[in-house]
Amino acid sequence: MTAKTLYDKLWEMHEVTRRDDGSSLIYIDRHILHEVTSPQAFEGLRLAGRKPWRIDANIATPDHNVPTTRAERQGGLESISDEVSRLQVQTLDENCDDFGILEFKMNDTRQGIVHVVGPEQGATLPGMTVVCGDSHTSTHGAFGALAHGIGTSEVEHVLATQCLIAKKMKNLQVRVEGTLPFGVTAKDIVLAVIGKIGTAGGNGHALEFAGSAIRALSMEGRMTICNMSIEAGARVGMVAVDEKTIAYVKGRPFAPKGADWDAAVALWRTLVSDADASFDTVVELRAEDIKPQVSWGTSPEMVVAIDQQVPDPAAEQDPTKRDSIQRALKYMGLRANQPITEIHLDRVFIGSCTNSRIEDLRAAAAVAKGRKVASTIKQALVVPGSGLVKAQAEAEGLDKIFLDAGFEWREPGCSMCLAMNPDKLGSGEHCASTSNRNFEGRQGAGGRTHLVSPAMAAAAAVSGHFVDVRELQGIETRE
């Protein structure tokens, strides 16, 4: 029997038929919807007189456009000041009501970012195919699922048929062996990977993260690395199932129960790459070599360790790369060879589908505890990824730690990750952000984004500039 990768197994489990052109019809187990990419899809169903093929396979929640201040949320839909944003959230409510789809509406305690809500509800299960009209759907691959983003026309196709046409990708394995040093996190791993292979390194591949350092990560850490596989060029990121996966899923609302649970677990334990499976490409990193990472430019691959400097374009031999560095330096307002620790900041954002789970908030709070946000920081936001994360953080007293330190404690949503709601950067402002993209204007027109881990973001907030979180004293960690 031919040895198979995890991706091979998941593909074969869901391949309905293979077409003459080499593409396949793939069955979709779970479809997650939000307000931005679904309106035209629902309208397409109406115009064609169709109904969803499997209503129970869909769940929805608004996240991109929702405001995050308590006052705005208490005001309901009418408090959304931007007309287009308000219409999108309202339309999602109406579409889900009309088609009978379960939605966690804006002020439901279960509402949150789609890629936080799906896993915490157990709607994402090992072995599933999971799609959503959002490129960071790769997050769900942390559960040994085949998950990727889709476009609006494909959202309609899944609603109508529960299937998609796709071509099988190549297999890429990223192995991270060893033990992560203190202060180095899952976010630092994935930024280091992107810095090594570039934003095109995973093009055309399904990326499986493996190795002892990956196995040592919590499920939340695995979600972080899979979330940013798309920034490495791979639509699909995944981690094989193990006992951590099963323990995380057990007892969640959508998880199987009783005999169904036992049968599911037996299957899930097979969702690993065979020992002698062949990958088209293998990339290796040593965990001990990874340091806290900070992006300096306008692409996630423009990233260096905290103890390094902004690159000098004059040292780059490739003219295309040299031009790219020069453009990024100009946009970011940085100088060649500037130490990362000399980058001063205006705002700090802790949140997004990459880093807004309870583990992320605990890590940031451990740094913030007993400290104060620097007087030069205009705003430091902490935005939980869901209402349930927010409630848990408040039960643990994390909100008080942040508030005492001078951070703002917000309601769940995508927030400052992208400029589609009131949380935005001003032109020329530098932000230490736990999000996933640092493109020009991503957080607001002219805004300058630096991608970091939650601990590094909190350290920057209390220092006013980037510092090595490992050098701060008195940080309490939780196992």
UniProtKB/Swiss-Prot annotation:
Cofactor remark: Binds 1 [4Fe-4S] cluster per subunit.
Class of the enzyme per the UniProt entry, highest EC level: lyase
Obligatory cofactor(s): [4Fe-4S] cluster
Binding-site residues, [4Fe-4S] cluster: 353, 414, 417
InterPro entries in the record: 3-IsopropMal_deHydase_lsu, Acnase/IPM_dHydase_lsu_aba_1/3, Acoase/IPM_deHydtase_lsu_aba, Aconitase_4Fe-4S_BS, Aconitase_4Fe-4S_dom, IPM_dehydratase_rel_enz, IPMI_cat
SUPFAM superfamilies tied to this protein: Aconitase iron-sulfur domain (SSF53732)
Keyword vocabulary terms for this entry: 4Fe-4S, Amino-acid biosynthesis, Branched-chain amino acid biosynthesis, Iron, Iron-sulfur, Leucine biosynthesis, Lyase, Metal-binding
Region forming the signal peptide: none
A Gene Ontology biological process term: L-leucine biosynthetic process
EC assignment: 4.2.1.33
Molecular function GO terms recorded: 3-isopropylmalate dehydratase activity; 4 iron, 4 sulfur cluster binding; metal ion binding
Pfam families, sorted: Aconitase
Pathway as given in its UniProt record: Amino-acid biosynthesis; L-leucine biosynthesis; L-leucine from 3-methyl-2-oxobutanoate: step 2/4
Reaction(s) catalysed (UniProt annotation): (2R,3S)-3-isopropylmalate = (2S)-2-isopropylmalate
HAMAP family per the UniProt record, alphabetical: LeuC_type1
Physiological role: Catalyzes the isomerization between 2-isopropylmalate and 3-isopropylmalate, via the formation of 2-isopropylmaleate.
Sequence similarity: Belongs to the aconitase/IPM isomerase family. LeuC type 1 subfamily.
Description of how the protein assembles with itself and partners: Heterodimer of LeuC and LeuD.
Name of the protein in its database record: 3-isopropylmalate dehydratase large subunit
Designated gene of the protein: leuC
